[in-house]
Amino acid sequence: MTPMSMNNFPRVFLKNKEEKEIQQGFPWVFDNEISHVKHRADEKSEWKNESLAECSIEDGKLVEVYTKAGGFLGSGIINKKSKITVRILGTEHGDEISADTKAYFEKKILEAFNMRRMFYKDSDSYRLIFGEADFIPGLICERFCDVKGRIFIVVQFLSLSCE
């Protein structure tokens, strides 16, 4: 576990012993697993601890996830209206992801595409991107080929984190 970062991203702290699944690669943090949220209104204001219900973080924002003891677990997108409150993007700190968001997601998409090409090189129809399995929560992309050989891509956005 890496230490707490010095950036300004909101921090979601899990309840005691709730980190095990995240450490094993599970991509979701449920609302009942969250102890509190630490954030500040702007760079000049003080950090404040609030319950999930009280916190004013805008849904769709990048947050960092920590153990109760303060060990860094990963970064994800928050949606307080969902039972799946945080969808993990990866084990990078928020500033690494936000430094070049476009490049970050292009890399994730290319990694997913290259993996599928290895397994489906002789197939004309398959799932290109499989959401959380590719660390792109809520995004499903499928490639289909019809009898005339035309290729179609079907895209589904299944969560706020993807929109």
Predicted feature locations:
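RNA-binding accessory domains that recognize and position tRNA/RNA substrates
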Residues: M1-E163
